[in-house]
Amino acid sequence: MGFKCGIVGLPNVGKSTLFNALTKAGIEAANYPFCTIEPNTGVVPMPDPRLDALAEIVKPERVLPTTMEFVDIAGLVAGASKGEGLGNKFLANIRETDAIGHVVRCFENDDIVHVAGQINPAEDIDTINTELALADLDSCERAIQRLQKRAKGGDKDAKFELSIMEKILPVLENAGMIRSIDLDKDELQAIKGYNFLTLKPTMYIANVNEDGFENNPYLDRVREIAEKEGAVVVPVCAAIESEIAELDDDEKIEFLQDLGIEEPGLNRVIRAGYKLLNLQTYFTAGVKEVRAWTIPIGATAPKSAAVIHTDFEKGFIRAEVIAYDDFIQYKGEAGAKEAGKWRLEGKDYIVQDGDVMHFRFNV
């Protein structure tokens, strides 16, 4: 399990350049030839240097990173929620994603026309957010009509859902975001099935010129907006990312060193998405394979075992655990055991990021 992030943005903001760089760097998946309706989907490996460090010690036959899926949603335009452009299909495609990566143009280039005729990140963000809010408003109004009938018949769940929808409605009518409303756990659970777009965790991917990472008023504006929303901003230069994606590993390292960059910006995008969804990684490390697994933060040992196979959760007995730092420091399982760093945990154990685990189960 990884996660699915929909990449949205207005036309000509560098969205497809960024997406193509992401998927070139990754594993080719269901890459439909881009047509007007189907989004492009790419699966990318999660960059995690810990995996290589574990493999260095264990020397497995293969190393498997955890992955994420990115979906390139074609350029949204004003009126998309009413079916303008290819609106309806695209909004339906975003609905299927777990998070939204909103690409915002923060660079000037006379050769690349901006749809609104000028660079204005605040307006661009507003255009997209308004379309998402209008699409949610439509879903909300229809839900209210259905729920009112059921609530009249005394349906308790319908009454509860209706009370939430009535809280959400005025916010959407003002083109606001549902994620700005303080909803508790039960309320969020009750409306989960609606897949509201403005409830999805969102990050802004600010597409800048090569020299636009500092002293860039457009980028500053995106940061201001994100801060108000409690959203994350990841600045990247899609043009550089697309060059990096064409290089082999050795050339990549050299190219990054020449630019004075530690790692490709896409790594930051992938990690920010991971964080956005409250995900973390644990590892299994054996001679056959060293592998990374994705779980929600706060998952118990049995729930974490289930991502390998549901039988592991059903027949869970115990988990053998070594913290990542201990595994590295004591050069593997035997060393960690000798140092007293190997332990057995029960079904209530909350798995920590980086735990190296082996599950005992009985089916």
Swiss-Prot record:
One of its GO terms (molecular function) is ATP hydrolysis activity. NCBIfam families: redox-regulated ATPase YchF. ATPase that binds to both the 70S ribosome and the 50S ribosomal subunit in a nucleotide-independent manner. The lineage of its organism: Bacteria, Pseudomonadati, Pseudomonadota, Gammaproteobacteria, Pasteurellales. Mg(2+) binds at residues 16, 36. Residues 3-256 form the OBG-type G domain. Its cofactor is Mg(2+). It comes from the Bacteria. GO terms for cellular component: cytoplasm. Belongs to the TRAFAC class OBG-HflX-like GTPase superfamily. OBG GTPase family. YchF/OLA1 subfamily. Residues 278-361 form the TGS domain. Pfam families: MMR_HSR1, YchF-GTPase_C. This is Ribosome-binding ATPase YchF. Keywords: ATP-binding, Magnesium, Metal-binding, Nucleotide-binding. InterPro entries: ATPase_YchF/OLA1, Beta-grasp_dom_sf, G_OBG, GTP-bd, P-loop_NTPase, TGS, TGS-like, TGS-like_dom_sf. ATP binds at residues 12-17.
